[in-house]
């Protein structure tokens, strides 16, 4: 699958206090409804829970460009309601919000257009090391339903890979890259969002 050079990837790490995951996802569901109706420039809007912490929400978002993310998506009323809740006096976050900017290196989002499912095995792995080595050694997995390699726009030494197997029982581990460190996170689709626009 090819992606336009302007495609902007946004990884969101939203770590809520105990019991906040449901409220955060409820607000994101309302944003998702708006995205589907009014944002053709939003190509992926996918939210999952951390497998070990249901109040840790992981987001994978793809936009036509960073400009439409900042000037259109983030200015919509449903998104502003969500953002205002995160910064409200209610203080729902256990840790500061992390928003990471990436570009696509290679890969595919939903090989057979099956759509996401809570039974999928999904692994998000960040690799830190020599940029040239990571670019050369990280490869797309043609057997995976999702295999997306992305490169940080903020830190040249940071790459990440999203791998998903659709209800197959396969549980892949991170790639072994010489001289690089890796941190992996298993996530479970929350029922909110999409990989490819329906």
Swiss-Prot record:
Residues 8-102 form the ABM domain. Pfam families: ABM (PF03992). Disulfide bonds: none annotated. It comes from the Eukaryota. InterPro entries: ABM_dom (IPR007138), Dimeric_a/b-barrel (IPR011008). One of its GO terms (cellular component) is nucleus. One of its GO terms (molecular function) is oxidoreductase activity. PANTHER family: BIOSYNTHESIS MONOOXYGENASE, PUTATIVE (AFU_ORTHOLOGUE AFUA_1G12025)-RELATED (PTHR40624:SF1). This is Uncharacterized protein C21B10.08c.
């Amino acid at each position: 699958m090819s992606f336009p050079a302007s495609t902007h990837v946004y990884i969101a790490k939203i770590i809520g206090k105990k019991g906040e995951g449901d409220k955060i996802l409820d607000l994101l569901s309302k944003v998702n409804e708006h995205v589907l109706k009014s944002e053709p420039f939003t190509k992926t809007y996918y939210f999952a829970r951390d497998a070990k912490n249901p109040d840790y929400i992981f987001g994978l978002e793809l936009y036509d460009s960073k400009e439409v993310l900042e000037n259109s998506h983030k200015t919509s009323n449903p998104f502003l309601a969500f953002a205002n809740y995160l910064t409200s006096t209610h203080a729902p976050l256990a840790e500061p919000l992390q928003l990471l900017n990436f570009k696509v290196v290679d890969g595919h989002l939903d090989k057979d257009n099956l759509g996401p499912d809570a039974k999928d095995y999904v692994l998000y792995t960040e690799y830190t090391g020599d940029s040239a080595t990571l670019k050369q050694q990280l490869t797309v997995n043609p057997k995976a339903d999702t295999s997306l390699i992305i490169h940080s726009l903020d830190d040249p030494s940071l790459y990440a890979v999203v791998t998903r197997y659709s209800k197959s029982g396969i549980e892949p581990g991170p790639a072994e890259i010489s001289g690089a460190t890796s941190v992996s996170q298993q996530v479970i689709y929350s029922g909110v969002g999409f990989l490819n626009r329906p």
